[in-house]
Each structure stands twice: as structure tokens, then as C-alpha cells.
Curated annotation (Swiss-Prot):
Its EC number is 2.3.1.47. Substrate binds at R20, H132, T351. Catalyzes the decarboxylative condensation of pimeloyl-[acyl-carrier protein] and L-alanine to produce 8-amino-7-oxononanoate (AON), [acyl-carrier protein], and carbon dioxide. It is an enzyme of class 2 (transferase). Homodimer. GO terms for molecular function: 8-amino-7-oxononanoate synthase activity; pyridoxal phosphate binding. Keywords: Biotin biosynthesis, Pyridoxal phosphate, Transferase. Pathway: Cofactor biosynthesis; biotin biosynthesis. NCBIfam families: bioF. It catalyses: 6-carboxyhexanoyl-[ACP] + L-alanine + H(+) = (8S)-8-amino-7-oxononanoate + holo-[ACP] + CO2. It holds the Pfam family Aminotran_1_2. This is Putative 8-amino-7-oxononanoate synthase.
Amino acid sequence: MSYQWLEKALKTIHQANWYRSVTAITSLPGSTIEIDGNTFINFASNDYLGLAGDPRLIKAAVEATQQFGTGSTGSRLLSGHRELHQELETAIASLKQTEEALVFSSGYLANLGTITAIVGTRDLILGDQYNHSSLKNGSKLSSATVLEYDHCNSEDLQEKLQQHRHQYRRCLIITDSIFSMDGNACPLQKLLSLAADFDCMLLVDEAHATGVIGETGAGLVEHFGCSNQPLIMTGTLSKALGSLGGYVAGSRMLIDFLRNRAPTWIYTTGLSPADTSAALEAIKIMQNEPQRRKKLWDNVNYLKEKLCDFNLFTSDSPILCLGIETVEKALTLASQLKEKGIFVPAIRPPTVPTSRLRFSVMATHEETQLQQLVTTLNQLI
């Protein structure tokens, strides 16, 4: 009796075309993947630099496992801390040009832990309406008052600050640097200016910018020359860096505070030796091989040019989204593309307000693969 509501809820999800299920990939990650014995060109991956299947990352992960075992065996404050963790945190801080960094077991946990640690019931959070789920849920869990401002609209944010800021002890402005389901960038410089004017903290999630944007690949903060500004950077090791885990980068005082107050860091097992070592190797490769990032952007610009007549969203990243009128049409197009050997996800409500096909471009895509996508889209649309 107590669980019968689940059947009705699932039926509603099916009727709305919101039902989701997993697809098993049976090959190494890369620009091509295998599913059910068939090969597909992969436009569904966040592996922007093509490092997740790189032999050097695999070697680093295997060697770390052989030396330190498969798990960290405890929280970082008890038995779970390894020198590898410190090496990775030092590398991240160096990349981000911050005093220190702290590694979490995922980017989601990094956001939840940081937000809930630095604000509470007497505080205000102002977040972009299109922020990632981890930022939104972290905001809810913090017990702070949460208001959303219109997407990338600094004028709306300013109005809300003028109206509400004075009522609260602390205020935290939260934004993605690159928005994962649209591909566009936040107005970072305007946000920094407003944070200074209204005595606010600013948290920027660089998940889809790290390794991709900026002169050294450090992210959007580097791109705008704001690395020396007082802000909090979070991100993931699971996208361009091809591993797993998340991080927070900022002042020494902030990181010291989080070690003592971030629940998702204190009360969970440390990142595995394999993931830690692979991420560390990825940062080295990213810094030593800038041609990977150049090839990625060559591919992005090629695809943008070829798809200029399509209904593409404005994008500042390797995430290119094609707006589709209905959920049903988005699902049909994704299925038709798959029949043609191209794996592209249909993104639909409630994840996003409107349906779309989301193409993730990789440095390892060949021009022939990009052209095959263009040709197929021209045939189908």
C-alpha cells in the first residue's frame, strides 16, 4: 500500500515522454563508441579533450591502484588521505591561480558541501535560474533564503540585490561559468562588480570550462583575467580531465574552513587513488599539450559554421544545442540519428524548459565525423 504511488508516478512520467533509462557503452570512451555491438560517432560525451581513454591516464590509474589499492578506505580526516590527494590539490590550485584547493569525491558533492558550509538561515542566495542541479540543491539544503535571477541577466540580479541584500547577514551569488544544457557563458565581470558593490560572495562552477576555456585551459575566470579576484571556484575532474571527482579552489582561509565545515568532504570516503592519479596526469597533459584545446576549438568552429542555418543556441563552448519544437520530435530525431550511426542525446523537460539535441564536441573528432553529422542533419531536418 505504501509504495503503490510509485506505479502511478512512473505511468505519468511515461505519458509525458519524460521517462529515462540507461544505455550501456561497451568500449573505451572516445569519439566513437560501441553500443550493442554497433559503432557510433559519439556526440554525447563531456570528455572534451579526449583524455578519458588516453593510455597515460589509464597507466597512471593502474599504477596508483597497484601502489595504494582500490579505495581510500576512509574519510580524508581519518584514514583516507594520501599524498596523491595533496599533489592533485596543489596542481588544481596552481592551475586556477588560487592559494589552495580541496578535492571532493564528485563535482556534485563539492557544490553541495561548499554552499551548505558557507551560508545558513540568516543568509541570502541569488542563483541563475539555469544553474546546475547541484548548485540548486546545495542552495536548498543550506537553509538560506534562495532567489533566482533571470538567466544571465545582471540587471535582474542587481534589482534583487537592491531589494533584498540589506535584509540578510551574508549573500552568496551562484552561477555556472558555462551552462551545461545551453553552452553559453555567464556575464562574469558584471557578477564580480555586483558582488563587490553589494558585499557578496561569488561562487562560479567551472565544470564545463576547466580544460576548455582560457589561455592555459584554467576556465572562464582565466579567460576574463579575473583569477586574482575574490571568488570561489568549483568544478569537476570528470569532464575535460577524464577522471572522477570535484574540487573547490580559493583562498587558504576558505579551504581551511571547508575542511572543518563541509559535510560532503568530512563525512565521505576520499577520492580513490586511481581517480586521483588519473586527474593529476590529465592536468599535466592538458598543460603540456595545448594543441588538444586548439583542435577542440577548431572542431567547434567548423561545426558552428556548417550548422549556421540551423536553430542553434548561442554558445561559448563545445556544447552546441539545436532547439526542437516538441519532446516527441526531439526523441524521434535522436533515434533517427542513432539509426545513422550517430549518438546524440535528446534533452527534454524537466531537465530543461524546452527540448533540444545537445552536441558535445571533442578534440578527437575527425572532420569526416563532423561532416557526417552535418550531412545527416541536413537529410533529417
